[in-house]
Amino acid sequence: MARYEDLPYRSCVGMMLLNPKGLVFIGRRVGGTELIDPAHVWQMPQGGIDPGEDYWEAAQRELLEETNARSIEKLAEATDWFTYDIPRMIAGRSWKGRYRGQRQKWFAIRFTGDDSEINVASPAGHKAEFVDWRWEPMQNLPNLVVPFKRPVYERVVKEFSRFAGE
């Protein structure tokens, strides 16, 4: 197995889904190797980029697969890629030990539908990644995620703060 320091980052997309009031969708994770802290189980949708897929296409697909949200409008794309390292203690279990963390392209997306459109139990027929969800004020997000993702969430909040609600 490669040394942790030599492992690449997995490229993926992250989606900040905002309702018309400027609150952000967060989902409570089903489980998985990233859940090392039971007090921090919430996160925004994120996922991999398929071969041949552009970043916005990946964001739309992943959002549908995780939330069932179809009524959306792109607000902004982050200017930079944001990266995080997963803790060494779970690096061998996450992504079969092939990556040291993720390199993420983030999007701010307006949800224009009714809350009943969101379905995390069986989103668009895909396996559930969340067991619960809610709308949360943007400034609260960094304190709800696992600590190793917190710096990315702080940057995402700063990048998209102009879309926050009161």
From Swiss-Prot:
<dbReference type="InterPro" id="IPR000086">
    <property type="entry name" value="NUDIX_hydrolase_dom"/>
</dbReference>
<feature type="short sequence motif" description="Nudix box">
    <location>
        <begin position="47"/>
        <end position="68"/>
    </location>
</feature>
<comment type="function">
    <text>Accelerates the degradation of transcripts by removing pyrophosphate from the 5'-end of triphosphorylated RNA, leading to a more labile monophosphorylated state that can stimulate subsequent ribonuclease cleavage.</text>
</comment>
<feature type="domain" description="Nudix hydrolase">
    <location>
        <begin position="8"/>
        <end position="158"/>
    </location>
</feature>
<dbReference type="InterPro" id="IPR020084">
    <property type="entry name" value="NUDIX_hydrolase_CS"/>
</dbReference>
<comment type="similarity">
    <text>Belongs to the Nudix hydrolase family. RppH subfamily.</text>
</comment>
<dbReference type="InterPro" id="IPR022927">
    <property type="entry name" value="RppH"/>
</dbReference>
<keyword id="KW-0378">Hydrolase</keyword>
<dbReference type="Pfam" id="PF00293">
    <property type="entry name" value="NUDIX"/>
</dbReference>
<dbReference type="GO" id="GO:0006753">
    <property type="term" value="P:nucleoside phosphate metabolic process"/>
</dbReference>
<dbReference type="InterPro" id="IPR015797">
    <property type="entry name" value="NUDIX_hydrolase-like_dom_sf"/>
</dbReference>
<dbReference type="GO" id="GO:0034432">
    <property type="term" value="F:bis(5'-adenosyl)-pentaphosphatase activity"/>
</dbReference>
<dbReference type="GO" id="GO:0019693">
    <property type="term" value="P:ribose phosphate metabolic process"/>
</dbReference>
<protein>
    <recommendedName>
        <fullName>RNA pyrophosphohydrolase</fullName>
        <ecNumber>3.6.1.-</ecNumber>
    </recommendedName>
</protein>
<dbReference type="GO" id="GO:0008893">
    <property type="term" value="F:guanosine-3',5'-bis(diphosphate) 3'-diphosphatase activity"/>
</dbReference>
